[in-house]
Swiss-Prot record:
Originating gene: PRR25
Organism listed in the record: Homo sapiens (Human)
Compositional bias ranges of the Pro residues kind: 356-367
Disulphides: none
Ranges annotated as biased composition (Low complexity): 345-355
Full protein name: Proline-rich protein 25
Annotated segments matching region Disordered: 1-29, 109-255, 337-371
Length: 402
């Protein structure tokens, strides 16, 4: 019998599709998870900074205008903790607004500091049961008497000096933690630039080939995702600005520094807020990469939710009042609100009762994000995953069902 690396079937699937726990349908198609994690039902609504997010305690409706529209929930979290990065499809199939509490998220654990470099295999920690003892890094034990003094006339050899790792406060016998190239102390990026994002595709021969996503996977946007992210915010490899409509690149709103762990400050791009950053974005499933970058790379999302309504209103989302840092909730941005002067975006939060025009009755629905053709598996090896833009791309378009 031929062996396969396919993981066991994952619970979940698209909401309203077979296999979802709320539908009672047949088992969903098995989903391949590179990290071996199984999806859990959760939605990051409040952006909790202690646990990485909690399920909502109340149901928040999208409104009747969202009926029949697929949405892609992308949750971004700060760097430095094992935090769930959620992606979920939220199709609303009836005229009644469906709550976000019923959405299913595909959860992947975001590794903290000390990411493995590209090509380094993952090593499973050995069990403490039945393992041979670790050799004493301080040399052979010296014979002692009952007073714990060396016995007279017995030599056990000179004691070697302590290893270099021990002299710097590291546990003797432990290997130093391997950090990805380009990461500074505590696993943060050594500079304001982001490391390259590798989107990998298995060719069936045990090797993985790095490929950019196709146009179909990014909604027609032709930006090369790995190159654009590797070049840093708002820069392409040839140092030209990215097509961010009507925006000026600004640092990510977050704790003291971009990429610092929760409650700490450190190297990286400076930020404006003293609280940790957690941006939860609800995008349409067919949103282009340019729309995502225009929202996330400008650093306008501080805390809470932002919703890109149907139409082009979301393209000018960065000029709205999102950076006010309002408490958790869904921010529905109307076209009129999205065109406000950037100078007033910190004064008042947007209204949460927007009702944009409903989608056309005969308009085709976008494909399920989990089944986008051309989407590749994601192996978090050299991507810092501390940037909302990186998380949006990796959780949004590098996930596929097989």
């Amino acid at each position: 019998m031929a062996r396969t690396d396919q993981k066991p079937p994952c619970r979940g699937g698209c909401w309203g599709q077979p296999g979802h726990p709320n539908t009672g349908g047949a088992a969903a198609h098995p989903t391949y998870h590179p990290m071996g994690h199984r999806p859990r039902t959760c939605i990051l609504l409040r952006g909790d900074q202690t646990t990485g997010g909690q399920a909502p305690s109340r149901e928040i409706s999208l409104g009747p205008w969202a009926a029949g529209t697929h949405f892609l929930a992308i949750s971004t979290t700060p760097w430095g903790r094992k935090t769930p990065a959620c992606i979920s499809e939220l199709p609303t199939s009836s005229g009644t607004a469906q709550p976000l509490a019923n959405a299913v998220c595909e959860v992947q654990t975001v590794p903290g500091p000390g990411l493995r470099p590209q090509g380094t295999p993952a090593m499973r920690a050995p069990s403490h049961k039945g393992t041979p003892p670790t050799p004493n890094p301080w040399g052979p034990e010296q014979p002692q008497n009952r007073h714990k003094h060396p016995k007279k006339g017995v030599t056990g050899g000179p004691s070697p000096p302590p290893p270099a790792a021990s002299r710097y406060g590291q546990t003797p016998g432990r290997e130093p933690r391997v950090q990805a190239p380009g990461l500074g102390p505590c696993g943060r990026p050594a500079s304001g630039r982001l490391l390259s994002l590798h989107l990998e595709k298995g060719d069936g021969k045990g090797t993985r080939q790095r490929i950019p996503l196709t146009d179909a996977a990014v909604g027609g946007d032709r930006t090369d995702i790995p190159s654009a992210i590797a070049a840093g915010p708002a820069r392409t490899p040839d140092r030209h600005g990215l097509p961010i409509p009507g925006s000026t690149p600004t640092p990510m709103v977050g704790s003291g520094r971009l990429g610092a762990p929760v409650g700490r400050s450190g190297g990286g791009a400076s930020a404006r807020s003293s609280r940790p950053s957690c941006a939860n974005v609800l995008l349409r499933a067919d949103a282009s990469l340019g729309t995502v970058l225009s929202v996330l790379w400008t650093g306008q999302l501080s805390r809470g939710w932002a919703l890109l309504p149907p139409g082009d209103a979301g393209r000018h989302l960065e000029t709205s009042v999102i950076s006010a840092g309002v408490a958790a909730g869904i921010w529905l941005v109307e076209p009129g609100e999205a065109a406000q002067d950037p100078a007033t975006r910190r004064t008042a939060p947007p209204r949460r009762t927007a009702s944009p025009e409903p989608p056309a009755p005969g308009a085709p629905l976008p494909a399920c994000p989990g089944r986008i053709p051309g989407a590749a598996r994601f192996g978090p090896r050299s991507c810092p995953l501390g940037s909302p833009a990186v998380l949006a791309v990796t959780t949004g378009w590098s996930h596929r069902s097989v």
